[in-house]
From Swiss-Prot:
Cofactors, names only: Mg(2+)
Protein name per Swiss-Prot or TrEMBL: Nucleoside diphosphate kinase
UniProt keyword Transferase present: yes
InterPro entries according to UniProt: NDK-like_dom (IPR034907), NDK-like_dom_sf (IPR036850), Nucleoside_diP_kinase (IPR001564)
Catalytic activity as recorded in UniProt: a 2'-deoxyribonucleoside 5'-diphosphate + ATP = a 2'-deoxyribonucleoside 5'-triphosphate + ADP; a ribonucleoside 5'-diphosphate + ATP = a ribonucleoside 5'-triphosphate + ADP; GDP + ATP = GTP + ADP
PANTHER family membership: NUCLEOSIDE DIPHOSPHATE KINASE
Note from the entry: Schistosomes do not have de novo purine biosynthetic pathway, hence they depend solely on purine salvage pathway to supply for their need for purines.
Family label: Belongs to the NDK family.
S-S bridge residues: none
Function: Major role in the synthesis of nucleoside triphosphates other than ATP. The ATP gamma phosphate is transferred to the NDP beta phosphate via a ping-pong mechanism, using a phosphorylated active-site intermediate.
Residue sites binding ATP per the record: K3, F51, R79, T85, R96, N106
Coiled-coil region list: none
SUPFAM superfamilies in UniProt: Nucleoside diphosphate kinase, NDK
Length: 143
């Protein structure tokens, strides 16, 4: 998901491009203003932390772009492509390493496990919003 700072900075296309160039298939995307209720559910595991109210306020301050990509090891490799949550620990070449300086404005969110990804997909998208299709390029990416 591209967070409000990433949307404001015009980085949505860059994020999509990096995943597609890696061979991942975009199957769902939308731009929306997330409700506080949705964000509280999404970040439920962080509810007891002191920065939680600030996180919810930030994430509801502007539009976000949730998206779903498919492909081999997309969650694991996607986390590497995004970079560390704290931008100062992110390697150059990662999205956060290239575009972030502050943990409070770190451009993107990515699921940390397949289980989290499934939970988050169900929070942000209805089954009808997930588009299943075959790409002509698939045989050129996967054996």
């Amino acid at each position: 998901m591209v967070k409000p700072d990433g949307v404001q900075r015009g980085l949505v296309g860059e994020v999509i491009q990096r995943f597609e160039r890696r061979g991942y298939k975009l199957v769902a995307i939308k731009m929306m203003h997330a409700s506080e209720q949705l964000l509280q559910t999404h970040y439920e595991a962080l509810k007891s932390l002191s920065f939680f109210p600030k996180l919810v306020a930030y994430m509801s301050s502007g539009p976000v772009v949730p998206m779903v990509f498919e492909g081999r090891k997309v969650v694991e490799n996607g986390r590497t492509m995004l970079g560390a949550t704290k931008p100062e620990a992110s390697c150059p070449g990662s999205i956060r390493g290239d575009y972030c300086q502050d943990v409070g404005r770190n451009v993107v969110h990515g699921s940390d496990s397949t289980e989290s990804a499934n939970r988050e997909i169900n929070l942000w998208f209805s089954p009808q919003e997930l588009c299943q299709y075959k790409q002509a390029v698939d045989p050129w990416i996967h054996e």
